[in-house]
Amino acid sequence: MTAIRGGSRRAPGLALALLGGVLLGACHGDENAQVNALPGFVSGSVRKTAYDGASDDLLTAGLGKTGLGSDTRPGFANPAQPSAAELRCLAIYSNYRALVDITPNGGYGRFWGPNVDLAGNDTLGEGKIAGTEYLAYSDDGSGRKNVTLLVQVPASFDPANPCIVTATASGSRGVYGAIAAAGEWGLKRGCAVAYNDKGGGNGAHEIGTGVVTLIDGTLATASSAGSSSLFTASESSSTLAAFNSAFPNRYAYKHAHSQQNPEQDWGRVTLQAVEFAYWALNEQFGPVVDGTRHGIRYRPGDITTIAASVSNGGGSALAAAEQDTRGWITAVVVGEPQINVRMTPGVTVEQGGAPVPSFGRPLADYATLANLLQPCAAAAVAATGAPYLSALPMGVTQSIRTQRCATLAAAGLVSGADTASQASDALAQLYAAGYLADSDLLQAPMWDSQAMPAIAVTYANAYTRSRVTDNLCNFSFATTNPVTGAVAAPAVSPMTNLFGAGNGVPPTNGINLVFNGASGGVDHRLATPDASFAGAFCLRQLWTANQLGIGTNVDAVRVAANLQHKPAIIVHGRSDALVPVNHASRAYVAQNSATEGRASQLSFYEVTNGQHFDAFLSVPGFDTRFVPVHYYDEQALNLMWNHLKSGAPLPPSQVIRTVPRGGVPGAAPALSTANLPPIVQSPGANAIAVNAGVIDVPL
């Protein structure tokens, strides 16, 4: 590893990592200087590492297609103190598998995977990709932002035909979070890939020990790491000690507890990732101007750059394109974007010619409502037969559903004299709030898997700029007894492999979401018979009563849907129950048509039987009913590439009517092209009409 010196801020942990490396001179400045200057937002030193494509590589960390597909995750020589390289390997393994279906019957190795080329053929063997990585922090000078930036430059990069693909992390994942969603396609295309962790990035602080993570996942104490930690809780050591005494075994997380509302910067940091990639490419391919330093070969706009990712990484790409004032981004391709749109009067979302009940709500609204109602709605007749996605016994889950319905009814929040009617009313309220009937069978697994509770709690903390010591709505993050769910000291600290195995949003990697009641903290599902209704209701009231500044902070993350006439594609699954299409993609497309009018170059592809988590597609009941949206994300990237490079027209907005695999849950037949109709130039009756602020999606 080579370290390129940037700024002067460097903590002991980083200093140790630099020992034995070669320090090359570089300076901060702007791209108009003769010498390639490190962007001013880069803090500390840049780590440069070359990978040979055999023992280690950019895409698979040396595991290859076979290793990524194996259920045996990579281990550590010393489990108590894994190396940075071992943590990187585990991070790539975990994040790749978290975003796609990794089963052969589900499409891995046939439609996607390291062995599959861009034409969809199995020609690449193990798919290892040689190249170079550049790793650094972006910061504002405070030492508290510390957004992780990473650029991968494959050995196949053609400096005469340069390209960049952004791969902003989805969820609150670490910097490798979108390696399967966008990084893989970019690397295979021979493009540099510009990653960033959005300033959420799986950073945690173990309150009881003071242990924090560094940029490479290795650990240090908060005091020794100083401003080089990925995240350190802002409270004083005495405040944290008092909190630990009252609430032991708790954890602070960066997205939830940084008090910075990081989402407001997601577009900006995605642009910074592109600028950092320009610097890296100039450093690698620019002319040598004084014997040691490189000049500038590429200036803003010189490199074909596609902003891409999924979920809130996709939302970040859209925000970046809107904020781009220097020509960094050429085009946008995103999947299932989590995006909060600033809707203007007159904009309308219709389906089958009729207005939908609700659209364009921000995540803070629909997530807190769903978290409150989903456990009850899961008991509705329309949700019968939903996939079961919980480690709890079915009897416990059924009891939770019954009790949540009863408590909601007692509070006057649902109507009905029995569980069935109460559940039906809860589901009807979700319909009225913009959820589609296509999502009926996903309401239960979105809550049972704890995806919705995790999002509701993390984002509520972020949008209220809460501290870990606030225990917002009596929720916190803690290790628990695996049998009782009560807060308990871990046998082994989850911090050791957090960088490699965590996803940044508890419950994750042994750190769980707990509700702090009179008897102490307990897994929120088990803390009360109604699964911590009081906490869920409190989260909902934050939004409905506009408490703790939540409205102001949500307004700060809204976007205008002005892509500045850049060509763009949005792909979204119609059945998505985590990021409902009415509130995200449909709303964005409608607002974009009002904002950009006929100058808009945005195409929208809505995938029937598509939902948010392709990694769930191997679960019984998911496999038979839902198809991989990732397949269409990659098709969209190919379409955009052909548009940019050969002028091929982008297919118009359309509904893609897929065919579920069917069969027996858990044993669905292999995915085939019969399940996955192509995106077409002439969609006919499947065309989505978009005009002057109105989108009408065929039934």
UniProtKB/Swiss-Prot annotation:
Signal peptide segment: 1-33
EC numbers for this chain: 3.1.1.22
Top-level EC class: hydrolase
Catalytic activity line of the entry: (3R)-hydroxybutanoate dimer + H2O = 2 (R)-3-hydroxybutanoate + H(+)
Chief localization: secreted
SUPFAM superfamilies: alpha/beta-Hydrolases (SSF53474)
Entry keyword set: Hydrolase, Secreted, Signal
Annotated Gene Ontology cellular component terms: extracellular space
Keyword Disulfide bond: no
InterPro entries: AB_hydrolase_fold (IPR029058), OHBut_olig_hydro_put (IPR016582)
Localisation: Secreted
GO biological process terms held by the UniProt record: butyrate metabolic process
Membership in a protein family: Belongs to the D-(-)-3-hydroxybutyrate oligomer hydrolase family.
Biological function: Participates in the degradation of poly-3-hydroxybutyrate (PHB). It works downstream of poly(3-hydroxybutyrate) depolymerase, hydrolyzing D(-)-3-hydroxybutyrate oligomers of various length (3HB-oligomers) into 3HB-monomers.
Protein's recorded name: D-(-)-3-hydroxybutyrate oligomer hydrolase
Organism per entry: Burkholderia mallei (strain SAVP1)
Lineage: Bacteria, Pseudomonadati, Pseudomonadota, Betaproteobacteria, Burkholderiales
